[in-house]
Amino acid sequence: MKTGEIPLSSSTYINFKQYLASVKPAGAALPTGLQDLLIAVVNTCSKLSHEVAQGALIGLLGPAGTGNVQGEVQQKLDIIANDLLIDGVQGCKSLAGLASEEMELPVPVQGTGDYLLLFDPLDGSSNIDVNVSIGTIFSVLKKQDPAAPLQTSDFLLSGRHQVAAGYVVYGPQTTMALTLGDGVVMFTLNKVTGEFLLIKDSVTISHSTKEFAINMSNMRHWADPVRRYVEECLAGVSGARDKDFNMRWIASMVADVHRVLSRGGVFMYPWDQREPHKPGKLRLMYEVNPMSFLVEQAGGVSTNGTDLIMDLQPTDLHERVSVMLGSKEEIDRIQHYHS
């Protein structure tokens, strides 16, 4: 049995509620309000897993005929996932407000707490119709002034302010990765009971790797440091790296990052010259910050090439950034090429 894996006997599994009640990420019990919020999010993801699995059988595939705040075509499941998550957490007394990739403005919640929830309800939704793994990404912040009315600026905190982050990937299994700032753990959904059960209690990313993920069709548009790194990987043993690499690309960030957390590697979605005024494609608050929190807590690194993602100060709720994350030795090399 590999280190960090839980024995397969059903009597030894720990469910999500039991885990939250027992963990002490800062030497003290996890606040009840944070437990309640995370349980509400995860219970909703359990329901969403069922909806995703039914797909065409209940008429949920295909475009919805609407667009989101980003100007992107919404899939039917995008809207359903967004509505499910909002409904699922509205009753949390510890929640002050939420923000979604699918909505222009944050939504106040009639709770008395000081937690803020940000989420991408269904990452990779362009892959729904071809049955590729998709997922939900979430991040939790603390409101700096609990007594003040909710404002968009309350959410504009760097990734270092996250108190929890995770994703749920809907694939052959429904699996969740979670960090509370003290390492990364993984759970798998028991679809009979609806419970998420702990399967790995210490997820780590190897410092070295021979695997990278990037959309190679855009190579001609990349900046020189990224092109140099990828060209060296492609050269393999005959080039400067003196080892062969494999390339992977799913076009679903949640699936690509899940692979990095599971077996190491590098995921890259860099700036390109087609839209030079935009620093990147992926959303800092809903996708990149929570994934970077997970990657750092697993021993990896996440950067935009020059700065660590977690240190970036956001200026817009829907801000986009470039990102390169994963195994430390490779990301350090990419950062060096940018210097």
From Swiss-Prot:
Which superkingdom, per the lineage? Bacteria
Q: Which reaction(s) does the protein catalyse, per the Swiss-Prot or TrEMBL entry?
A: beta-D-fructose 1,6-bisphosphate + H2O = beta-D-fructose 6-phosphate + phosphate
What are the binding positions for Mg(2+) 2 in this chain?
A: 120, 123, 287
Q: Provide the primary localization.
A: cytoplasm
**GO biological-process terms attached to the record:** fructose 1,6-bisphosphate metabolic process; fructose 6-phosphate metabolic process; fructose metabolic process; gluconeogenesis; sucrose biosynthetic process
Going by the UniProt record, its keywords in alphabetical order are: Carbohydrate metabolism, Cytoplasm, Hydrolase, Magnesium, Metal-binding
Return the NCBIfam families for the record. Answer: PRK09293.1-3, PRK09293.1-4
What is the protein's given name? Fructose-1,6-bisphosphatase class 1
Instruction: Output the lineage of the source organism.
Output: Bacteria, Pseudomonadati, Pseudomonadota, Betaproteobacteria, Burkholderiales
Recorded name of the encoding gene: fbp
